[in-house]
């Protein structure tokens, strides 16, 4: 079962290539990214988290990332049931071990049809099955 990040990965890579986006955390990485995308005499902007792109591509990048995120959520729901998605995230954040579902709730906040109430219900229904501690 794929995670949301895995569903987004290939689409993001295509967008990064189209918008000449790269990640740099040092002057050397900055130069390497500029060289890879043949960027010369172009104003670059930081998009956060080390992500850098030419200024003229910033809006396209931002809008593209938002679209990929929303489309990938819908793809996730299409590929997996809501119940399986919630169980995947409860397990991923070790909620059955810690008893704290807040990270799961936060991660699924943008999923249509998934609420904190539903997550609590699925957590309680499956607690004994998945809590092996």
Features from the language model and the residues they span:
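Soluble, non-transmembrane alpha-helical interaction regions
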Residues: 1-133
């Amino acid at each position: 079962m794929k995670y949301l990040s895995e569903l987004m990965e290939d689409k993001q890579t295509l967008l990064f290539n189209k918008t000449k986006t790269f990640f740099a955390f040092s002057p050397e990485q900055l130069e390497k990214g500029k060289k890879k995308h043949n960027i010369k005499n172009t104003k670059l902007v930081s998009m956060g988290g080390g992500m850098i792109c030419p200024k003229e591509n910033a809006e396209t990048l931002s809008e593209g990332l938002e679209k990929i995120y929303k489309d990938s959520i819908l793809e996730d729901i299409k590929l997996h049931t809501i119940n399986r998605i919630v169980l995947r995230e409860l397990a991923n954040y070790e909620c059955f071990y810690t008893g704290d579902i807040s990270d799961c709730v936060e991660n699924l906040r943008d999923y249509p049809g998934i609420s904190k109430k539903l997550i609590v219900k699925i957590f309680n229904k499956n607690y004994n099955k998945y809590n092996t501690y």
